[in-house]
Amino acid sequence: MAAVILERAAEFVAPGEARVGYPILAEVYRALTSDHEMRAFYETCAVSFFALFMLIIWVLHASRHPEGSTTRGTDAHTQTEGSTTRGTDAHTQTEGSRDQGSMTPEADDLTRPPLGHGRQIPVLRRRMVLDRDLRIDYSL
């Protein structure tokens, strides 16, 4: 490919004429863009590259903000391993309450609307119910 480019550039430079620096680049550019088909090819490549770049940006943005997504485990209301406080705020289940629903949070979350201000976090609530029922001790 480089040999073809240099041959086409050499056609525009007169024999015995020595050009150094920028003029030789101008001759190479003129050689590459003189052919209408090559110019159309370069324009198509540029448009395709731009479209691919925009598609990648869109996919990355969509993966960071999925529709109807819920934030899990990133706020102050999650229970860490080893903690024993239960029922101390609105996001935890108290000792006397019972869990209504399936034990698979993924299937349950698909049918529920996104979290609002008055909703509990279902995954956290189920984990606490399982911990209480199985009496799992996380302390070392």
UniProtKB/Swiss-Prot annotation:
Transmembrane segments: 44-60
Biased composition (Polar residues): 68-103
The UniProt record lists the keyword Membrane: yes
The UniProt record lists the keyword Transmembrane helix: yes
Alphabetic keyword roster: Membrane, Transmembrane, Transmembrane helix
Location within or outside the cell: Membrane
Cellular component aspect of the GO annotation: membrane
Name of the featured protein: Putative membrane protein ORF7
Species, as recorded: Ictalurid herpesvirus 1 (strain Auburn)
Taxonomic lineage from the root: Viruses, Duplodnaviria, Heunggongvirae, Peploviricota, Herviviricetes
Gene symbol of the encoding locus: ORF7
